[in-house]
Amino acid sequence: MARLARLRRWTARVACGGAVVIAGVVHVPAALAFPYRADFGSTTVLSEQPIDRAAMGRVLARADGLLATSPLYRTGLSRQVVLTDGGWRWDVLSIGVRNAIAFRRPFAHALVFNRSSVATDRVTNGAPLGGVRTLSGTIAHETTHRLVADHIGEWAALRLPAWKREGYPDYVAGETSIRPGDEALIRRLDPTAPVLTYYEGRRRVAAELARNGGSVDALLKD
């Protein structure tokens, strides 16, 4: 019995230690030793492929131009842009959100992207419908999540209804992953497809901002 108790304690410690390691990695992507790194002012880019500084600079400039349309934007925001090939590093980092095009973990400064192409300014999760966005627009989208969280608090941001939580970042990005001609097809195939939350949310946010005189503070109230 004593040996069994020791084994259980050892197993629990290993499981706890493994959970701590995983939690650390998903919040600190640099722990996965990305082979390429480049700094652009207060933005650090980690990548699985060589980084074309000129092309990446254009992508970031477009993203920041989109962000500048939001009253929440501030220059010099520290962030980490993590570009993957959709392989094992993505699988490790994206636990719980593996089908996403990109994501930001709460309380984290890292923005993590699925299969990315800097040269073409594209990022995809491989879905045949609603699976492609501009990389620059998606950087703007994920950075907006950070701006909202900084403005109203992480927990308040998480409690926002989905149409506000995802709709405002898409409004700032000026895009969703659904082409207008694909909306009807997606609704026929799956009326509850998560991608529709973004599409509908952006339209609702645009309508609400038009109604309230453009007040983002009013929009972000619960």
Task: Outline where the language-model segments fall.
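Auxiliary, metal-adjacent structural segments of Zn-dependent hydrolase domains
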Residues: 58-117, 132
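Surface-exposed patches in mature extracellular/periplasmic domains of secreted proteins
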Residues: 67-83, 154-160, 182-186, 216-221
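Short pre-active-site segment immediately N-terminal to the catalytic Zn-binding motif
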Residues: 118-139, 154-160
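Pan-zinc metallopeptidase signature
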Residues: 12-17, 21-35, 194-222
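Post-HExxH zinc-binding segment in Zn-dependent metallohydrolases
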Residues: 151, 158-193
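Extracytoplasmic/secreted envelope proteins and their assembly/folding machinery
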Residues: 57-64, 140, 166, 170, ...
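Active-site recognition of the HExxH zinc-binding catalytic motif
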Residues: 137-150, 169-170
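N-terminal low-structure segments adjacent to metalloprotease catalytic domains
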Residues: 1-58
